[in-house]
Amino acid sequence: MNKKRIFLLLASIFMCLQLVSCSNGEKMQDGYYTAELSEYNNGWKEYVTICVMEDQIVSVEYNAKNASGFIKSWDMAYMRTMNTIQGTYPNKYTRTYASQLMENQNTDNIDMVSGASSSGGNFIRLADAVIEKAKNGDTTIAVVEVEE
């Protein structure tokens, strides 16, 4: 009789552990996932696209585009102006944020870039959205509301 109780107790514990491990360890599904802001801000709409392979983020693109599709980090005049005033520019800070996501595989330890902290906040929200999409295997574009 005691062996039966011990077996049932161990089986119950094992089943509980399985349920906990399944709910906490969501794996990302292979594919490309994109999130973009819901609106343009100063003429630009920021977006993040990641590529996931074997539960790892293997590439990250973070940028912004205008209504005609022109990419912000390609705007040399904007770069010169921003670099003079802020000490950084889109092609620099977008790569910094993207490389931090690649290294950490999450947004927990993303360091803000001086002069681009607003974009850093947007990046974290966009990256969290694409990671959630990757966990669900949902390749539709996530739309993230612009913070006021």
Describe the predicted segments one by one:
Residues 25-148:
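Active-site- and interface-proximal helix/loop "cap" or "latch" segments in soluble metabolic
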